[in-house]
Curated annotation (Swiss-Prot):
Composition bias, Low complexity: 735-744
Name of the protein in its database record: ABC transporter B family member 2
Organism ancestry: Eukaryota, Amoebozoa, Evosea, Eumycetozoa, Dictyostelia
Gene3D superfamilies in the record: ABC transporter type 1, transmembrane domain, P-loop containing nucleotide triphosphate hydrolases
Compositional bias ranges of the Basic and acidic residues kind: 49-79, 107-117
Family from the record: Belongs to the ABC transporter superfamily. ABCB family. Multidrug resistance exporter (TC 3.A.1.201) subfamily.
Species of provenance: Dictyostelium discoideum
Single GO BP term: transmembrane transport
Residues annotated as transmembrane: 137-157, 191-211, 273-293, 369-389, 407-427, 801-821, 846-866, 922-942, 948-968, 1028-1048, 1101-1121
Amino acid sequence: MSDKSNDGGENDSLPMDNININSIDDENNNDINNQDDNENNNNNNNNKNSDDNEENLKDYKNKKEDFGNIKMDTIDDRPTNNGILSPIDITSDGGDSVKTLSTTQSKKLDEGEKKEGEVGPQVPFFSLFRFAKPFDILLMIIGTIGALANGVSMPAISIVFGRLMNSFSPENLADPNFDLVETVTSNAMYFIYIGCGVFVCSYVEVAFWMLAGERQAVRCRKAYLKAILKQEIGWYDVTKSSELSTRISSDTLLFQEAIGEKIGNFLHHTSTFICGFIVGFVNGWQLTLVIFALTPLIAAAGAFMTKMMADLTKKGQDAYAKAGGVAEEKIGSIRTVSTFSGEPFEVKRYTERLKEALDIGTKKGIMNGIGIGLVFLVLFGTYSLSFWYGGKLIVDRKWNPVPDRPWQGGDVLTVFFSVIMGAMALGQASPNVASFANGRGAAFKIYEVVDRNSKIDPFSTEGRSIEETVQGNIEYRNIGFSYPSRPDVKIFNNFNLTIKKGTTVALVGDSGGGKSSVIGLLERFYDPDEGEVYLDGTNIKEINIHSLRRNIGLVSQEPVLFANSIAENIRYGNENATMDQIIEACKTANAHDFISALPEGYDTQVGEKGVQMSGGQKQRIAIARAMIKDPKILLLDEATSALDSQNELLVQQSIEKLMIGRTTIVIAHRLSTIQDADQIAVVKGGAIVEIGTHPELYALNGVYTQLVNRQQKGGDDGDKKKKKKSKESSKDESNNNIGPSSISIDKSIQSIGADSLETSTIGLVNDNDNKKKKKKEKKPQEKSVPIGRILKLSRGDWPHFLIGLVGATLNGAIMPVFSIIFSEILGIFQEQDTDELTRRSRNMALWFILLAVVAALANFIQIYCFTFIGEKLTFNLRRLSFESIMRQDIGWFDLTENSTGRLTANLATEATLVQGMTSQRLGLLIQNIVTIVAGLVIAFVSGWKLTLVVLACVPVIGFAGKVEMDFFQGFSQKGKEAYAECGQVASEAIGGIRTVSSFTCENKILEKFRQCLQKPIQMSFRKSNVSGLSFGFSQCTLFFIYTLTYWYGGKLVDSGEWPAKESTLETYCYNGEYANIGYTDEATCIKSFTTTEGFSMMMRVFFAIIMSAMGVGQSMAFMPDLGKAKLAAVAIFSLIDRVSEIDPFENKGQTLPEFKGDIEFKDIKFSYPSRPNKAVFQGFNLVIPHGKKVALVGNSGGGKSSVISLLERFYNPSQGSITIDGVNIKDLNLNWLRGNMGLVGQEPFLFSGTIFENIIYGKPDATMDEVVEAAKAANAHTFIESLPDAYHTQLGDKFTQLSGGQKQRVAIARAIIRNPKVLLLDEATSALDTVSEKVVQVALDNVSKGRTSIVIAHRLSTVIDADLIVVVKEGKVVELGTHETLLAENGFYAELVSRQM
C-alpha cells in the first residue's frame, strides 16, 4: 500500500498546544490530489484488474404485508479506568454502517462479498493507519506510551494493598513500637503518586489517540470521496449511488472509531493484563498459576462473544444499508410519492427493509448476554478458587520464594488483585476488538474503492494537452460498444462516423437508436469495446481526460444544478470566470433578465438539484454554464427542450451564433431545428442508415423522409415545416442515458410549483416556522425532551422492562455484596486459628460460587431485556421519523436543512443516538443506581464518619463529568451540522456525477468538501484536549480519594472506632486465652483484634464507597452519549411533532359519491411561503368544465405549473378557493383527491425495482393484464417485451436500462393505470421521438375522453384541439378561448403561434 494514498502534510511540532489545526487542510492539495499518481500511470492498461461492486437489488413486493419492529444500534460504552474491582464492562461496538448495494444484470458477487455464515472481508490491522502522517505517528507513539503507562496503575495499586495488609500482621500489631497511623499514611501516599501519573497518562492516552484518529479520518473521508469521483461512469452504472454518499458518513465513522481512542483504551487494558500477571507471578507464582488456569475461560467467553457480535453487526449493517437506500430514494422523489399517495406504502416498505434486523438485534442481545454472563460466571468462580487456595497456602505455611517467608494474607491480596485485574482488563479490551473488526471491515470497502484503478480516471495527468491545438475533427472508427450494466446488449457494432472541424452534425432517429451513446463515447464517459474514437487524428484515449472534456461543452436534456448560488453553478463551467463573463453568458442564454428579477440576483440559491428553479430556468442556467466554458466542441442533447417558444427562439439563435467555428453534435427529435446542419446522420439500431444534408436525405425518400413527413403531419395545422419549436427532449440510449447518474430529487414533477419566478428562493415554509426551526437548531440543547416520553414509546415492552429491572437490580447489588464478602476475607486471612481460617475461607468460597451464578443470570437477563427494549425503541423512532418526513408538505422539503442527504443521514444516526437513553445504557444506569444506593447503605452502616468524609469528595467527580458532558453537547451539535453539510456535498456530487465529469469540476467538489471538513478539524483539537483532561481528572480524583480514605480510616482504626466483637475477645483474649495465640498480655491482644476488625470494617467502607464511586464514574462515562442522545431526541421529537399543513396520513375529509371533474379556481391569491411579498397569483380565476381538455400556455415563469401544484395540493392558496364539483379541495380527503388525478411531468422519475413494480405504483392492486394494457396504451409494451427480463427488468437507481423516451412511457403507463378522472399533463410527451410521440399522443387523447384534462404545453401544435386554451402571463389569465377564437383576437396567443410558425 503506497504512502501516496495518505493525504495530509503536518506541522510536526510539539507540544499539542502548538498544533496547527489548519495543517490538515494544507495537506489536501498535495497528498489528496497526488494520492493516485502512480495508479494513474496504469489506469488505461489495467481495465481487467478493476472489479466493479455488484449485488442484486431486492424487489419490493407484498405491498399489503404488515411488518415487524426493528432497530440496530451501536453500543459504545467508554470504559473507565476501573477502581479496585469493577464490573466487567464488555459491550459490543456495532454501527449503523451502510452497505453499498449495486445494480447488476450479470448476477456476479463482488470479490469482497461475504458468503452466508462467513466473516466479512477485512483489511490487516496496520493497514488502518495508511492515512497517518509523521505527526500522527508521533501522536500515536506518545499516546501508546501514555496508555501503556496508564495500564500499570492498577497492578501497582495491588502491590500497595498487599503491603498495607501485611502491615496489619499479628507480629506488627503485637509490637509496641508499631505506629499504625504512620504506616497507613506512608502507604497511602503511594496513591497520590499513582494518581498524578494516572492524570498525565489518561490525558495523553485519550487526547493524543483521539486527535490522531480524527486527523486520519478526515483524510480518509477526502480520499474516499476523491476515489469515488475518479471512477468511470460505467462503475456508477453497476453501483448503487444512493448508498455511496451514506457510506462516506457511516463507514468512515466506523473507521475512525477503530483508529482513535479505542486503540488507546485497548493498549491501556492490555498493559494492565500483562503487568497484572507479571506482578502476580513475581509475588506468588503458585496462586497465580491457579488463577491463570481459569483465565483462558474468560478470554474464550470474550472471544466467543466478540466473534458472534461482529458477525451479527455486519448483518445488521447490511439490513440498514437497504433501509437507507429506500429512505434516500423516497425522500429524494417526494413529489412523485405524493402524487401517487404512496406515503403510507413507503413507510411500510421502509419498515420491511428493517424486518431482518429485528431478528439480528434480538440475537445480538442474546449472544451479548450469554457472553458477558459467562465472563462473570468464570470471574467469580475464579474469585472462589483464589480465596480458597490462598487460605490453604496460609494454613499450610507454604513458602513464598520472593519475600522469602511463608505466605501471608497480603501476598494473597496482591496476587489476587493483580491477576484478577489483569484478567478483567482482558475482558474490558474485548469490545474494542469488535470495534477494530468493524473498522477493518469498513476499511476494506473504503480501500476497495480507493485502490480501484479507474478505467477512465479524471485525475490522471497522463495524456496530451490539447487546449492550444484542438481543431475539432472527430472520427468514430469501427466502434463496437455495450454498456457495462448490459454487456449482452450491443449498442454499436462496427459504427463509423466522421465529423469535420467547424461543422454541425445532427443525429436523428427513433428513441433507443444509440444517438446519446455517441456523445457518451466522445466525452469518455465510456470507452468502446472495439474500435477507436479520434479527435484531430489522435485517439482520445491518448488525450488527457480533463483537457479533452474542457474543450467539450455539453448541454443535456435534464440539467443538473448544485445546491449553490446561480453564479457558482455557472462558474462550474469556468472556475476563473469573472462576474462580467457570467452575466454575458447569461444574457446570451436569455437568463439574465429572470435572474436579475430575483431579490438576490446571481447570489440566489438554486436549492438541491436546482429544485427552486423551473425547468426552463434550469435549462438556461445550464446553457450559460456551457457557454462560459467557450468549448471547441459543442454537444447539444435537446439543449432547448425545456424552454417556451419565446425563450427557445432567442436561445436557439444564441446557440447558433455560438456554433459558428465550432464542431457541433446535435441530438434532436424535432427535425425543424437541425435542417440547416452540415450533415444529418440517421441512427437506427446502433448504425448510421442515412447521412447527408436535409435536401439530400429528403430526396432519398427513405427513413429521414418518413421522419420529416410524420412531423409535418403533426405540425401546427399542417403549416410550414419550421413550426415546431417544441419541448421534445430525449435521452436516446437503448439502455443508458448520459444524463445524471442518480438524480435523487424528484425529476418527474420537481418543476411543479417552481415554474414561476416566485419559486426561485430556498425554503417554501412560512417565516415563523422557519425562525422557530432556526432558533431550535441553534441551541437544541436548551430544549429538553422528558425521559418519560421516550420511555412511553416502549410501553408495550413493559414485561421485558420488569424482568430486566430485576436483572439490573441483582446486578447492581452484586458488587456491594462483594465488598462485604471481601472485607470478611481480609479478616479471615488474619485469623490465628488455622481450623477456623480453613472453615471460614471455605464458606466464603461457596458465597462466591453463589455470587457467580447470580451474576451470570442477572447479566444475561439485564443485557437481553434492555437490548430488546432498545431495539424496539429505535425501530419506533426510525419509523415515526420516516413517517413524519413522509407526512410533511412539499415546501418543507425545499429547505436546505431538509435536503435528501441531511434527512437520510439524520434518519440513520439520530434514532441510534437516542438509544443512549435506553437499551443497555438504561440497564447499566439502573444497575449503577442500585450499586450506589446499596454501597452507601453498607458504607454508612459500617462507618458513617469515614463515609461522610469520602462522600465530600464525590462532587469533584461529578464536576469533571459535568464539564465533559457540557462540552460534548456543544461539540455533538456542531459536529453533526458540519458532517451533515459534508454529506450533502458528497451526495450531490455523486448524484450528478455526469455533470461533475463533463465540467471537470472534481477538484472543485473536493475543495468544497475540504472546506466543509474545516470545522470538524478545528473542533477535534478542543474535543481531544477537553476529553483527555476531563477523563484524566476524573480518574486521578479516585486515587486521591483512596489516599484520604486510608489516611482518615487509619486514624479511626487507631482510635478504636470499630471495636472487636465481644465473642471474639472472649474466645482469644479474656481469661488468659491470649497466651495460647502468642500475645504477652490481654491489652495487646484486644488491641490487635480491634485493629484487625477496624481494618476489615475500614476496607468494607472503602470498597462499598468505591463500588458506588465506580457506579457514578461509569454513569459519568455515559454523559457524552447522554448529551448526544438529548440533542438527537430534541431533533427527532421536533420532527415527529411538526404538524404538516397538508398531511397525506390524515384520513379525514369527504369523498364524493361521483367525481365529475368540474374545477374552479376562485379569487386565488398565492405566494410561496418563503416569498410572501411576491405574489404568484392575485385574484386568479379559472373555470374548467368536466370532461374538457384545457390547455395552459404562456411564457416560462408565468405560473402555469403553480396551477397544477395547487390542484394537487402540494401547496395551499393564501386566499380564495379551489373547488371540484363545487367542493373546496381542502374539505376533500387528500388521498382520495390525488387518487382521482393522474399526473405526468416533463422529467419522469422512476424507482429502483422492476418495470412492473413501477407501473403498479399508480395502482398497487393492479393485475398483470392491467399493467400490460396500460403499457400498450402508453406505447411501452413493445419495447418492454423486447428486454431480456421484460416487465421484470430491474431498473436500478439510475435507470440506465431505459432511454429518456422509454422512461417517459413507463411514467405515462403508471398514470394511466389508475384510470384517473382528471389528467394533468405537463409536457407528457416531451421526451418521445416522433413515432412514439404520435402514438402516445393518440393514446392520451383517447384516455382523456370523458375526463377533465389540464395540459401544460409550450408546443402549441399539441393543444390546438383543446376545448379551452388559457393563456397565462405573470400569474394572470390574459386570454381564454379556443384556438380559432384566440387567433382571431390577434392577441398574445396569436403572437405565441406566430413565433412557432
